[in-house]
């Protein structure tokens, strides 16, 4: 977590109070959630998206290179107690968490959390492949449908999830399918990293640094550059799950 994270959050909260922005969402791995949950509630965060790929301690420790699942769950439950809306994002990984799909659905239903299952994307080390990890979302849909039923619902967010409900109470499940069901034509996302680098697409390296504009008060130039780059967003990504990574950049660098 950046040392000045709360300063940024306070700034965004003021913008929200002035109605310059309508919502504040936070995406996190949850490791610092217990510490910051009260601040997130105080400064108007509308929803917390928590990346959580396993509910089994040993698996979580492995996939996060030493993370403590108990601490993350404590943070999530504290945020829930404070009234924050929580959405769990789970990347589907073959032979790793495909045996947890049902238990994750049940846990989210019990705690009234929204849930999205996401296909793994070929990003990261250029000479690595995600082929052995890939599971299409339809596999997860079939598993859930057989156990709990699955019906599409007319619910949309600003993101790419397609939502369904099950026979369980408090159960709303989204599926994000960048590989098997490309949604690039409806993508409305841009990303600015913590180091000030603008990216128009997760699947392309095209970028520019916004810091020189901000540091020299070239705000109008920056606005024009942002408009230009948004207009020039690529038509689609070129992810191929049976090939090597498309970009040499990890998701935690860009922001999910």
Regions flagged by a language model, labelled:
Residues 1-118:
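Radical SAM/AdoMet-radical enzyme domain recognition
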Residues 106, 110, 120-256:
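Auxiliary Fe-S-binding modules of radical SAM enzymes
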């Amino acid at each position: 977590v950046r040392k000045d994270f709360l300063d940024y959050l306070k700034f965004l909260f003021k913008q929200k109070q002035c109605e310059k922005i309508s919502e504040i969402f936070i995406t996190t791995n949850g490791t610092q959630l217990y510490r910051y949950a009260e601040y997130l509630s105080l400064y108007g965060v509308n929803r917390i998206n928590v990346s959580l790929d396993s509910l089994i301690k040993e698996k979580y420790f492995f996939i996060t290179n030493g993370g403590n699942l108990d601490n993350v769950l404590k943070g999530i439950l504290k945020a829930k107690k404070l009234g924050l809306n929580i959405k769990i994002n789970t990347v589907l990984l073959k032979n790793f968490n495909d045996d947890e799909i049902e238990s994750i659905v049940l846990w989210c239903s019990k705690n009234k959390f929204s849930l999205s299952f996401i296909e793994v994307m070929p990003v990261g080390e250029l000479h690595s492949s995600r082929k052995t990890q890939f599971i299409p979302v339809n596999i997860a849909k079939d598993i859930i449908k057989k156990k709990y039923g699955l019906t599409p619902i007319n619910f949309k967010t600003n993101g790419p999830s397609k939502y369904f409900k099950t026979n369980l109470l408090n159960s709303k499940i989204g599926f994000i399918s960048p590989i098997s069901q490309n949604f690039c034509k409806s993508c409305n996302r841009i990303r600015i990293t913590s180091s000030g680098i603008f990216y128009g697409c997760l699947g392309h390296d095209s970028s520019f640094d916004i810091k020189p504009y901000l540091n020299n008060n070239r705000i109008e130039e920056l606005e024009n550059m942002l408009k230009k780059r948004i207009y020039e967003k690529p038509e689609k990504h070129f992810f191929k799950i049976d090939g090597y990574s498309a970009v040499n950049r990890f998701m935690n660098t860009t922001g999910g």
